[in-house]
Curated annotation (Swiss-Prot):
InterPro entries: CBS_dom, CBS_dom_sf, Cl-channel/antiporter, Cl-channel_core, ClC. The keyword Metal-binding does not apply. This is Chloride channel protein D. Residues 1-256 are cytoplasmic. The gene is clcD. It comes from Dictyostelium discoideum. PANTHER family: CHLORIDE CHANNEL PROTEIN CLC FAMILY MEMBER, H(+)_CL(-) EXCHANGE TRANSPORTER 7. Residues 1-90 are annotated as: Disordered. The keyword Zinc-finger does not apply. The lineage of its organism: Eukaryota, Amoebozoa, Evosea, Eumycetozoa, Dictyostelia. Pfam families: CBS, Voltage_CLC. Residues 824-881, 926-984 form the CBS domain. Residues 71-80 have a biased composition (Basic and acidic residues). Keywords: CBS domain, Chloride, Chloride channel, Ion channel, Ion transport, Membrane, Repeat, Transmembrane, Transmembrane helix, Transport, Voltage-gated channel. Belongs to the chloride channel (TC 2.A.49) family. Residues 1-16, 38-60 have a biased composition (Low complexity).
Length: 1000
């Protein structure tokens, strides 16, 4: 091997030698880059290589040049980084790798592997000729060159060190990256499994949701919708023309007269229900207390038997006699006023069953109230009085025929529902607003005045009857003394807001429990009637045990601090306990632990009176009504305590709901401080007990409501918060737990029902203090906001669980992305203007209640719409249809009257097949004012048309008015649109593809 060129791998004189690396490249690209000491030798080698390169350059392709160039550049890198610390190993490995390359053939020239001797490598010369120190150099130049060499050497070492560090860092980073990849793969495997499981569960959930929706859809189909849209056809126009002068005045006067009688009748029913409940409850507790004086266990058996007997009888009525009477009836009334026809909801049979079941259930001690049934009863009264007819009793009054349509009936039902609330709470304005805010879906100014008038009459009737019977006014809330209370402190807004938050959370919990219980009943209990009765028996049995035995764990308290002093009074035939008297005349009185103050016995007159353990001392007293003292004494429950003492838990739980609310809302007065009359633990346990039992009881097989339990639960936790604040602040400020109880009652009721304005007005009316308007509104709004963030309102969820089609006030977000062609029925059943009798077989073949009427089968241009009920009447009076210009032709007023009474079934008609070809003209009967929309019409806007106008059917047409489909109320339900959007979203379409879904 020649020593002249370290890269030469053969005899230089051999004609078949392979070209060297330097022969393939120009001198500027060679590896000879040594210092000036080796320049001459390298130049000679380069010249020789250039000569050889010129001879063979034409036979080497540019591709191989590029490849060799890459190799040379790599060798340059290795040569420049050569040192004794390990880079030589890398260079040697590279050379051995190059020696292992296979032969390559290019254009007939065999390229031999290049063999390189690594021992000939020398490090690159660090210094150039300019760095040499010459004799003629000045001292400064010598110093500069010396430092320059040193600097270059230092830079070289630094560069070499940096390259080593960089190389090692690269290796470390690569190792770390590989390690992280290994860790990530190990970690992501379970994550991927979890993601896959989640995706699989999501698919299973979607399949389950779809199955549930199809099941719910079948349940929804059993309900029909009401016709709130007036049918304007030729027959109706003729009737309007004939009676045009009587249209406005007569009908409006009749509406006010009907509203008057509705209010009176609802007030009478409210009074009798209240009187029955009060008397049954009063005598029940008196009897149990009398037995309690004899034996505790015997008193429990008596209390248990009485409660279970009353509750079971109530359940038997609601299960076997009229099942529609069970529950509060509010979801059914809301659904009806939204446009859904619910069978048996407004029948007189339902009213009497509701009344009796409500009286028995509330008297039994169930955690339920009477206001919900009163709303339902008021709605039934509104329906019955407006129609002036009854199928059960078989009578009709002809002069109210003009109100026998769904639209007028809806208005009277709305007024009746509000009057039921007004009579229950003695709040006419609150009842009107409740009807507007909660149950009604369609409202007008004229309806507002009539509804308010009906509520005033119902409240006045109720109060007059109660005042004549010696009772206090109001069915739900009695005189609590709140009206005499001074205004609140500004810092109390903070605990009021806390009460609002707790009301929202508690209301959401109450709703969730009731929904879960309702689902359980629907799947396990409601299918068997006997189980429904057994459930009521178990509920009242367990509740009775807790009501009776829980007070035994609480100690007795003295009633003296909570009884006002009595002076300058005359009392006759009474029994007084722990009273203070002076200058009084007492006749036939009995005194226990009493104080007679201010003077000697000669200052007072006693006739046939007995004094036990009493003290006659000097003292002072104030004038006070003795009847009020008797009332105060009746609010305390002795239970197992001695005379003059009471049990705080029995005062709450061993009492009627009226007495419980009265004690909870009791505020301080000038004579008595009621802060400590009910302690913290009784408040807490009573709230928990009532919350869970009321949530479970609501919806069972008895006629009960939930509004009163909401008030009781809210008042209990509100008073509890007030007591906590009182114990924290002490006597520094005036804290009245009774005010906190009012705020709690409003908050919890708002958290469950989401009522705001009507609830605030009702509580303002029953407390008679406008100064609490601001804190009440803040508390109620806070409760509503918190509950809205957690769950839907209770009555809306109950309607969904009962499969009642209901259009909410606001449309869902999915509706804004869809068009009518996405949700419409694609193949609507239609009739022609002039059709045949045989084509009316669609009444038997389908369950549709509305049919678009087109001009003919070819063009299918929409001309109107006809209802199933109209076709049934045509079939019934088919002979009249063919008499043109006759009075016997289809009559609109007769149709509406027939509709509210009884129409024949399609199976009642049997026509001769020979008559099937007979032509029927529907142009005089069909509704000419049918509303149609284009296939591209937004679903959200179609929803607004249905919601505001009370539509039942909406044909869908193209730009030429050709029938393409039909939309009904059930197609616009929130769940329906969500399911349809989910199906479209599952297709993963863009907005452009989504627009064209449904096109032909």
């Amino acid at each position: 091997m020649s020593s002249g060129n370290p890269f030469d791998n053969g005899n230089p004189n051999d004609g078949n030698k392979s070209p060297s690396i330097d022969e393939l490249y120009s001198p500027s690209e060679s590896l000879a880059r040594d210092g000036d000491d080796n320049n001459n030798n390298n130049n000679n080698n380069n010249n020789n290589n250039n000569n050889n390169n010129n001879n063979n350059n034409s036979s080497v392709s540019e591709k191989k040049k590029s490849k060799k160039k890459v190799r040379i550049q790599e060798e340059e890198r290795l040569t420049e980084s050569y040192d004794d610390d390990g880079d030589d190993e890398e260079r040697r490995a590279y050379i051995e790798n190059e020696e292992g390359e296979e032969e390559e053939t290019e254009d007939g020239i065999i390229l031999q592997p290049i063999v390189r001797d690594h021992s000939t490598y020398r490090p690159k010369n660090l210094y150039g000729s300019s760095d040499d120190i010459r004799e003629g150099d000045s001292f400064g130049a010598k110093v500069s060159k010396t430092f320059g060499k040193t600097n270059k050497k230092i830079k070289q070492k630094i560069g070499e060190s940096n390259k080593k560090i960089e190389t090692r860092v690269k290796h470390s980073n690569k190792a770390i990256e590989e390690g992280w990849k290994t860790i990530a793969q190990t970690t992501m495997k379970p994550v991927d499994n979890i993601r896959e499981q989640h995706h699989r569960r999501a698919e299973q959930h979607e399949v389950a949701e779809r199955a549930v929706w199809f099941k719910d859809k079948l349940q929804i189909q059993k309900y029909e919708c009401l016709d709130y849209v007036t049918i304007y056809n030729k027959a109706h126009r003729n009737e309007l023309y004939k009676n045009f002068s009587k249209l406005a005045s007569d009908h409006e006067v009749l509406r006010w007269i009907v509203s008057l009688f509705m209010g009176i009748f609802i007030g009478v029913i409210a009074y009798f229900s209240h009187a029955c409940v009060s008397n049954i409850t009063k005598y029940k507790f008196k009897f149990v207390e009398a037995v309690l004086e004899l034996d505790l266990f015997l008193a429990f058996l008596t209390y248990f038997l009485l409660n279970t007997l009353l509750a079971t009888c109530s359940s038997l009525l609601a299960v076997y006699y009229e099942p529609t009477a069970a529950g509060s009836g509010i979801p059914e009334v809301k659904g009806y006023l939204n446009g859904t026809k619910i069978p048996h909801t407004l029948k007189m049979k339902t009213l009497w069953t509701k009344f009796l079941s409500m009286v028995l259930a509330v008297s039994s001690g169930l955690q339920a109230g009477s206001e919900g049934p009163m709303i339902h009863i008021g709605a039934i009264v509104g329906n019955g009085f407006s129609q002036a007819q009854s199928k059960e009793f078989g009578f009709k009054i002809p002069f109210l025929r003009s109100f026998r349509n769904d639209k007028d009936k809806r208005d009277f039902v709305t007024s009746g529902a509000g009057a039921g609330v007004a009579a229950a709470f003695s709040a006419p304005l609150g009842g009107t607003l409740f009807s507007l805010e909660e149950v009604s879906s369609f409202w007008s100014i004229a309806l507002t005045w009539r509804a308010f008038f009906c509520c005033m009459v119902a409240t006045y009737t109720m109060n007059v009857l109660q005042s004549n019977s010696g009772s206090l006014t109001g069915l739900i809330i009695f005189n609590t003394g709140i009206g005499d209370k001074e205004s609140y402190n500004w810092f109390e807004i903070i605990p009021f807001l806390l009460i609002g938050v707790l009301g929202g959370l508690g209301g959401a919990l109450f709703t969730w429990i009731n929904v879960k219980v309702t689902e359980f009943r629907r799947e396990k209990i409601n299918k068997i009637k006997s189980l429904r009765v057994l459930e009521v028996f178990l509920i009242i049995g367990l509740s009775t045990c807790i009501q009776f035995f829980l007070p035994l764990f609480f100690s007795c308290q003295n009633t003296a601090p909570f009884i006002p002093s009595v002076g300058n009074s005359t009392l006759t035939d009474v029994t007084l306990t722990n009273g203070a008297f002076y200058n009084s005349t007492i006749i036939n009185g009995t005194f226990y632990n009493s104080t007679i103050a201010n003077g000697t016995i000669y200052n007072s007159k006693f006739y046939n009176s007995s004094i036990y353990n009493s003290t006659i001392t000097n003292g002072t007293g104030v004038s006070y009504d003795p009847a009020e003292t008797l009332k105060e004494l009746s609010e305390f429950k002795r239970f197992n305590c001695k005379e003059g003492w009471y049990n705080p838990m029995a005062t709450l739980i061993f009492a009627s709901y009226e007495e419980s609310i009265t004690n909870l809302l009791k505020v301080n007065s000038n004579n008595v401080t009621n802060t400590e009359r009910l302690g913290l633990w009784p408040m807490f346990l009573f709230c928990i007990f009532y919350l869970f039992f009321a949530a479970y009881t609501a919806g069972c097989a008895v006629a009960t409501g939930t509004l009163v339990p909401m008030l009781v639960i809210g008042a209990s936790y509100g008073r509890f918060v007030g007591l906590v604040v009182y114990h924290i602040l002490g006597d520094k400020v005036s804290i009245d737990p009774g005010i906190y109880a009012v705020m709690g009652a409003a908050a919890f009721m708002g958290g469950v029902s989401r009522l705001t304005i009507s609830l605030t007005v009702i509580l303002i009316e029953i407390t008679d203090r406008l100064k609490y308007l601001l804190p009440l509104m803040l508390t109620v709004m806070t409760a509503k906001w918190v509950a809205d963030a957690l769950i839907h309102p209770l009555f809306d969820l109950l309607m969904q669980m009962k499969y009642i089609p209901y259009l909410e006030l606001d449309q869902s977000k999915e509706m804004k992305l869809m068009m009518c062609k996405h949700i419409m029925a694609k193949k609507p059943v239609y009739l022609a203007e002039k059709d045949t009798l045989g084509n009316l077989r669609v009444l038997k073949e389908t369950r549709h209640n509305g049919f678009p009427v087109v001009n003919n089968d070819e063009e299918k241009l929409v001309k109107g719409l006809i209802l199933r009920t109209q076709l049934l009447m045509i079939l019934e009076r088919i002979s009249d249809v063919y008499i043109p210009n006759s009075e016997a032709i289809y009559s609109h007023i007769e149709y509406t009257t027939k509709l509210t009474w009884k129409l024949p079934s399609v199976n009642d008609f049997n026509f001769d097949p020979a008559d099937y070809s007979q032509e029927i003209d529907l142009s005089d009967v069909m509704n000419l004012t049918v509303i149609t929309v284009n296939v591209e019409f937004a679903v959200s806007e179609a929803f607004q048309l249905f919601r505001t106008m009370g539509l039942r059917h909406m044909p869908v047409v193209n730009e030429n008015n050709k029938l393409k489909g039909i939309i009904t109320k059930k197609d616009l339900l929130e769940k329906t649109c969500e399911q349809r959007y989910r199906e479209l979203n599952h297709m993963k379409l863009g907005i452009d593809q989504l627009i064209h879904v449904g096109d032909e």
